[in-house]
Amino acid sequence: MQNPQNPPPAGSAADFYSQMPVKVMGTPGAPGSQSTPGAPGAPGQYPPQQPGAPGSNLPPYPGTQQPGAPGAPGQYPPQQPGQYPPQQPGAPGQYPPQQPGQPGYPPQQPGQSGQYPPQQPGQPGYPPQQPGAPGQYPPQQGQPGQYPPQQPGQPGQYPPQQQGQYPPQQPGQPGAYPPQQSGQPGAYPPQQGVQNTLAKTGAPGQPGVPPPQGAYPGQPGVPPQQGAYPGQQPPMGAYPPQGQPGAYPPQGQPGAYPPQQQQVAYPGQQPPMGAYPPQQGAYPGQQGAYPGQQGAYPGQQGAYPGQPPMGAYPGQQQYGVSAYSQTTAAYQTGAYPGQTPMGVYPGQTTAYAAYQTTAIGYGATSTYSYTRPTYSYATPYSRTAAFVVPVGLPPHVVQKMMAASAAFRIHDSNCSGTLSKKEFKKLIKHLGYYFSKGQTKMLFHSIDRDYSGSLSEREFVDWWSMQ
């Protein structure tokens, strides 16, 4: 058997991992055989044997220490006091300090200045555990000016417990709110009336003796006052008055509204003086009716609204005679629109002017048409030229015709020199008159004297000059 090669250099990694006890089998005493156990190996043998018993621990790795050996200062973890973490408490600056009396955080035994929290009273700190020191929170024993005071009765505290404060805990003090014991001046509500010092001699409830101050009607010993509510006779001017002149609501007195115990003026009764309606006579139809002319409503003398005598509403003597054709109509002379005397509807002597059917009674009809005036024009009509008025007209008629021509040309949208029914309706509204569709149609056909279905400028101007 050939021996292995020389071992690796001492201290190398190969040497560290290859040093293992090797047992060589051979004859004792023979050359090359291993010595007996316990004898140190010869130098140069492999593996090299260390002094000591066989199987002893191998030497540690360089730079390492065996477990359990105390460490050198600066190592981690330090095993000696003064290191971090300290294993033996009580050294200054350590964390946590285990011995009392040393400054540190947190202190285990209270009472030291600057510690948190202070356990002994009398030291400034937060929060104090035993009250009574000024400036501590919360104060358990009330001091003047503190909030909230625990013991009442000190000035300026809240809530005050003594009189004059808000809310008072002991009732019956003047000015307190609410007073718990009645009978104090200014108390609310008074429970038992205080006798008026200015009251006349006598027991409450007697005539001439006023009730106690602050008493409410209906309490024992409180007499009913004059004008009390309900059911008593009130003084003059009380509310509600019972039968006094001018009161509201009065009960049967002259001038009352409404009179309860008088003849009623509506309808047909003879009213009292000052009743409503104030005129003598019924409403409607009696003398002095409302409004105050003699005659009924409508159609009598002095009717409403104020027509001439014997005129109905509007413009009738009575029902069935000339309903809309009288000269005494409600629409008076020249009213609608801009008519000459005796004309109501433009240019007519009847209430409805141009081409209208006037009811005479019920059933009979009559027609009245517009008569166009005859004017002499010097030149033929031209839509592109300015309108030429007839010869020999007064200035005010000329002015009306020029205004009508200007309005006509505004609504002649197609510059044809004629107006359709729709354009004519807009023109009438432009001039400030508003008719129904049927009225506008009748007026249109009354002006259209040539039956062309449209209005020429001269037809319209001639009609307007008559208004």
UniProtKB/Swiss-Prot annotation:
Q: Residue ranges under compositional bias (Low complexity)?
A: 63-74, 132-145, 153-193, 215-246, 253-311
Give the location of motif XYPPX in residue numbers: 45-49, 75-79, 83-87, 94-98, 104-108, 115-119, 125-129, 136-140, 146-150, 157-161, 165-169, 176-180, 187-191, 221-225, 238-242, 247-251, 256-260, 275-279
Limits of the EF-hand domain: 399-434, 435-467
**Which PROSITE patterns does the record associate with it?**
EF_HAND_1, EF_HAND_2
Q: Which UniProt keywords apply?
A: Calcium, Metal-binding, Repeat
User: Which molecular-function annotation in GO is an example for this chain?
Assistant: calcium ion binding
Q: Where is this region: Disordered?
A: 1-311
> What name does UniProt use for this protein?
Calcium-binding protein P
This protein's species is Dictyostelium discoideum
Question: Which gene codes for it?
Answer: cbpP
